[in-house]
């Protein structure tokens, strides 16, 4: 089992952990429907960038 040679200081520990923070998902609002969605994803209604790209109800029924 590996054992450290010298104790790591609080500063070095915290500097290592500085990259561990979680980020919130980036959300967008569709200009047509006003729905909130993930960036580069369509809304649950099937809109993307203000255009209807898929009929969400029929696509769900086909699966």
Curated annotation (Swiss-Prot):
GO terms for cellular component: large ribosomal subunit. InterPro entries: Ribosomal_bL32, Ribosomal_bL32_bact, Ribosomal_zn-bd. Residues 7-16 have a biased composition (Basic residues). Residues 1-45 are annotated as: Disordered. Residues 25-35 have a biased composition (Polar residues). GO terms for biological process: translation. Keywords: Ribonucleoprotein, Ribosomal protein. It holds the Pfam family Ribosomal_L32p. NCBIfam families: rpmF_bact. Belongs to the bacterial ribosomal protein bL32 family. This is Large ribosomal subunit protein bL32. The gene is rpmF.
């Amino acid at each position: 089992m590996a054992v450290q040679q010298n104790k790591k200081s609080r500063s070095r520990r915290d500097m290592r952990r500085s990259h561990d923070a979680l980020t919130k998902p980036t959300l967008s609002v569709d200009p047509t429907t006003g729905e909130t969605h993930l960036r580069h994803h369509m809304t649950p209604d099937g809109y993307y960038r203000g255009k209807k790209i898929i009929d969400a109800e029929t696509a769900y029924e086909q699966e």
